[in-house]
Amino acid sequence: VNAGPGRVGAAPVALVATTAEVLAHPELDEGLLAPWERHRLAGIRVPARRDDVVAARLLLRLCASRVTGLPPRAVEPAQRCPGCGRDGHGRPYLPDHPGLGASFSHADGLAAAVVGPGPVGIDVEPLTRRPGPVPVLRRLLPHDEVDAACAEPEPGPALLRLWVRREALFKAGRDDVPLTAWTDRRRAAVVALAAADGATGATGVGGACRGAGTDGATGAGRADRGAGADRAAGALVPALSLGPAPWPSRSPAPPSGR
């Protein structure tokens, strides 16, 4: 199945939600997952973590659906590890849509995904998480960016913003992709999005479209300031509305969410 002409040139679509919101969405259910994905889920022993993984994979399908115009069940993501060359893990991609990039993330009751032309990457972390001891971060991240974050009035949140930005760029596979970071206060989440074109960003669903630059219960989020050069808040286009009403709700080491 291929998207119609012009679809691949569409703006990226990025979605962020709680795991409960995703699992309650009427278009999404675990039956959409491929057999190889369900096989991998069988190895996850912690129910909450399993739900997070399911939610992220379903959200990726919803993003792909919004970009291609196909129903979520017609989208079949795959994964391939660039290191070992084996399938089933590593960077996600859409075999039937080679012009589109894909990325997802999950962490402690949160899920995020993005699909769009060219390289894309997304990362989400709980607002209260701290990425780890500074000496460890200096081994993983550019020293000058870590030092700049440490010089902020609140180093913990600044280091978390730095971490999610770098994770988003890592997932995109390039350091020169435009980067946007914002805080979703309603879901107590920090999000970073790397996308080659201006993304249609959405935090959750429901209600009328809200413009960028908001920092409340339903907005797309404000652009965070701090270490690293992000696009201004105005670069976020209005949030995508997926329905007439909101979705029903149903470390010493670096963050583990992916």
What are these regions (language model features)?
Residues 1-210, 215-258:
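Core catalytic alpha/beta fold that binds nucleotide/phospho-ligands
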